[in-house]
């Protein structure tokens, strides 16, 4: 059993389920509060000792693990989601190399964490607005740009846009964690079986 691969798939599941919520809210105007809260909490847990601690528990990323399970078995129902995930994983490389942007994002996350503590909810609309604004002012200017498509009616609403951007920030945070755990795009070519086995273990 590879502990590092087990950790990697949890982080990758964090990416997947944050982006699934992006897709959901862009199409329907609604997200799943518990899943969004897991994503937002992960943004604030920058000093957590393990991926499980980042998300609260492995069970908290079960939706993302199921997405990975289906993807690896060619049973995915959303063709756009893998493309979004690839864009986020590529964007993470640009982000971590831009030290000024990293510093700005870290400062903004600290401020949003204090706000969340005062409001008593990491999923509060004001917190989502702060994190969404932070993403818009920083990471969104890097390439590749993550393009979100959906229902124009919802994409024209400020609250929806803020939540989407906050979720994209959470997806990038999980991508950073994935790299920290040794993740690489080469894994999808040369370690796919190990990834599948790690996902299966996590879902048991």
From Swiss-Prot:
Matching Pfam families: DUF489
Localization per Swiss-Prot or TrEMBL: Cytoplasm; Cell inner membrane
Main localization, broad class: cytoplasm
GO annotation, cellular component aspect: cytoplasm; plasma membrane
Record keywords: Cell inner membrane, Cell membrane, Cytoplasm, Membrane
InterPro entries, A to Z: HflD, HflD-like_sf
Topological relation to the membrane, as annotated: Peripheral membrane protein
Family: Belongs to the HflD family.
NCBIfam families tied to this protein: PRK00218.1-2, PRK00218.1-6
Protein name, entry field: High frequency lysogenization protein HflD homolog
Gene name per UniProt: hflD
């Amino acid at each position: 059993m590879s502990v590092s691969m087990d950790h990697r798939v949890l982080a990758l599941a964090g990416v997947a389920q944050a982006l699934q919520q992006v897709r959901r809210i862009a199409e329907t105007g609604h997200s799943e509060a518990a899943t969004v809260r897991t994503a937002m909490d992960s943004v604030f847990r920058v000093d957590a000792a393990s991926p499980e601690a980042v998300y609260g528990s492995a069970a908290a990323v079960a939706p993302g693990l199921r997405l990975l399970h289906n993807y690896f078995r060619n049973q995915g129902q959303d063709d756009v989601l893998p493309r979004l995930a690839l864009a986020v994983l590529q964007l993470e490389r640009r982000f971590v190399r831009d030290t000024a942007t990293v510093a700005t994002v870290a400062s903004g996350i600290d401020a949003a964490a204090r706000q969340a503590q005062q409001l008593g909810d990491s999923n509060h609309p004001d917190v989502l607005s702060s994190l969404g604004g932070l993403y818009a002012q920083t990471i969104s200017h890097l390439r590749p740009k993550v393009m979100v498509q959906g229902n124009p009616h919802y994409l024209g609403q400020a609250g929806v846009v803020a939540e989407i951007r906050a979720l994209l920030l959470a997806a990038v945070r999980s991508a950073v964690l994935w790299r920290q755990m040794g993740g690489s795009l080469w894994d999808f070519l040369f370690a796919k079986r190990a990834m599948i086995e790690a996902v299966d273990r996590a879902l048991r």
